[in-house]
């Protein structure tokens, strides 16, 4: 089966949720899943379910750098090193019998210069033919849009955060 590229993007809720849902579906079909998270600390509730599945590996950065807007130059440099190392590690792992490779928030990591988009594009072009790939995040470049076979935009029309309601465990994270 030819692997395709999915891109879930936009300012609306549901990008990671869609990627998790596809991961569970693939795992349920006996597929091997590698779920990598960028810009998050690995504590989101959905990762508990993924980690419990036998044929799913979750990869996150061990260090929490906080929100990009709050990072100083030194923290951005450290984050760039850590996320670039994570990307290299998971790209290598994804070529070893993985069926579905999720790069959650990789689009945002590219936008912030924390991983090199050119590295990601080169990987997408040279990946194993059967490898299905999911990318999530806001504001993808035209290069990422062009590389994707599925492009789904999640657009916010209304969100409780706009009324001051904070993210809730088990719903938003």
Where are these regions (language model features)?
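Conserved P-loop
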Residues: 4-92
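Hydrophobic anchor at the start of a short beta-strand
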Residues: 33, 133, 151
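Hydrophobic/aromatic ligand-binding patch that stacks against planar heteroaromatic rings
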Residues: 25, 49, 123, 143-144
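Phosphate-binding/switch region of NTP-binding enzymes
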Residues: 139-173
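Conserved nucleotide-binding/hydrolysis micro-motifs of P-loop NTPases
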Residues: 39-42, 64-65, 107-108, 139-142, ...
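Phosphate-binding/switch loop-helix module in NTP-utilizing enzymes
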Residues: 70-132
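Conserved D-loop beta-strand region of ABC ATPase nucleotide-binding domains
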Residues: 136
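Short, glycine/charged-enriched secondary-structure capping and boundary segments
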Residues: 22, 48-51, 73, 115-119, ...
